[in-house]
């Protein structure tokens, strides 16, 4: 009798809760395999991006005719991918070497806008500021180097800020920026020493 009662209880339990249990199991399996698919898809995407990065950087180094267009397309289609951001940095360097500053600005700006890693974003910001200075877009460059950056880039940013302020004729502010560069750990290179000396003389 006890066994029969247990069976009946199981039947009643299953009748009341069976659909929910099945649904839970199905959802559980769905989530499990969904995450497995997501992980696999993510891995495959990263592997393709890595392969494209290696190919494109090699082509840029070799000066391939189609390298710039292919790199621009890759960066445009994958702005948040780290490999695409590395390609953008390489593309910008390639463009600067060929005095194509507009292409360099576009590539670096994409990294500044999309990079989730603060160091990647900071590196792109410093490089972009240098290109903007070369284009005489001093206000735009100044806004980049004055924004909060990781400590490792503070010295570079302060020196660039000094360069911009000196170019704008703000001697006292430029000197203060160079001093901050030294305090941030930037080495007193001959170039930085010359900049400070020129401000003293002026």
What are these language model-derived features?
Residues 75-84, 98, 112-121, 147-156, ...:
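Short solvent-exposed coil/turn linkers within tandem alpha-helical repeat scaffolds
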Residues 142, 146-202:
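Extracytoplasmic/periplasmic C-terminal soluble domains
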Residues 1-27:
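N-terminal positive-inside, membrane-proximal cytosolic segments immediately preceding the first
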